[in-house]
Amino acid sequence: MAKNSRSPWIAKNLQRLLNVGLIMLAAILVVFLVKETIHLGKVLFLSNQETSSYMLIEGIVIYFLYFEFIALIVKYFESGYHFPLRYFIYIGITAIIRLIIVDHENPIDTLIYSGSILVLVVTLYLANTERLKRE
């Protein structure tokens, strides 16, 4: 009986700890997002043309990764302490696209990465069908 009365208290405190941790993570990600914005500005206006296009594209994709993680944390609080699966899939697709942009020397690896993106897109489609949709 004593165990059952403590369970809600433990769950409530663990939820608070998780919320504080996610708020701190969001603050850190916002700092990184600002730093990436400054870096993108430097690459755009101060770098030479040859290297700046690759650095700019890579920076933009990294920027979107930070943005997606912050959006995931916001959605967690908006949806009643639940992480929607589709946001993780978006982050995975963006991360693999960044990997293809940065490391595209081996054609077999690029093909495998592209296949991974296809699998994630199919998963996203299946997760958004009416039978599986929760939100």
UniProtKB/Swiss-Prot annotation:
Cellular compartments annotated: Cell inner membrane
Instruction: Describe its membrane topology.
Output: Multi-pass membrane protein
- Give GO terms for biological process: cellular response to phosphate starvation
Task: Write out the transmembrane intervals.
Answer: 20-40, 54-74, 82-102, 107-127
UniProt keywords, alphabetically: Cell inner membrane, Cell membrane, Membrane, Transmembrane, Transmembrane helix
| One GO CC term, this protein | plasma membrane
The protein depicted here goes by the name Protein PsiE homolog
